């Protein structure tokens, strides 16, 4: 049985995440995160191309992800392009270090559980990609971001992907339903490129038969 992190108040939740960051957790589910390279739909953007080549977050990419002028889908594409590694990565830590330098107030607000939707989204998705074997902490941050900014499809879809990643073995139907249900909740248009959404659905739809 999975313990829902939604029962924690926002401030307490983020504090808990900082405390348990180094605690090992069991690996779960399939690999929706490392099987959906939707950044391919954004390779016209120089930041995405740079991320795909470097695979490591630098200050310029961190600033781009955190900038209010960067749309959520483009920030997500950069994070997706940075990729994953079976040995783990530390890009979410790099982003927080950069945030601490460039906007100490935003960093402190995040640390005390009052982070903006952009910071929550960026740290959450980076953390999920950095440690895709254990995504519950990242899932909690993305849920907070989604609650703060429910109008953005990109946040909702990434959250659904991370939830799918952390589903218990045997709940494959939920891997299919999560992204599809998310898509259905945004009938009036998506701010994410359709070709990027297709990459995600092409993977998660392979589990459709598990819902029969």
Where are these regions (language model features)?
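Amphipathic alpha-helical repeat scaffolds of TPR domains
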Residues: 31-44, 67-90, 114-130, 153-167, ...
């Amino acid at each position: 049985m999975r313990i829902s992190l939604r029962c924690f108040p926002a401030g307490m939740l983020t504090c808990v995440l900082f405390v348990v960051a180094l605690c090992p957790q069991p690996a779960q589910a399939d690999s929706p995160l490392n099987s959906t390279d939707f950044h391919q739909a954004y390779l016209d953007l120089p930041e995405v191309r740079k991320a795909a080549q470097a695979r490591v977050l630098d200050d310029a990419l961190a600033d781009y992800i955190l900038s209010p002028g960067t749309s959520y889908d483009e920030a997500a594409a950069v994070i997706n392009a940075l990729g994953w590694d079976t040995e783990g990565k530390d890009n979410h830590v790099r982003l927080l270090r950069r945030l601490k330098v460039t906007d100490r107030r935003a960093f402190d607000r995040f640390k005390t559980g009052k982070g903006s939707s952009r910071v929550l989204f960026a740290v959450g998705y980076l953390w999920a990609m950095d440690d895709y074997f254990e995504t519950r902490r990242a899932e909690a941050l993305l849920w907070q971001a989604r609650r703060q900014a429910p109008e953005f499809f990109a946040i909702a879809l990434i959250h659904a992907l991370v939830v799918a990643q952390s589903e218990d073995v045997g709940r494959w139907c939920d891997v299919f339903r999560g992204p599809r249900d998310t898509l259905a909740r945004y009938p009036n248009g998506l701010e994410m490129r359709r070709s990027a959404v297709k990459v995600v659905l092409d993977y998660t739809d392979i589990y459709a038969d598990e819902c029969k």
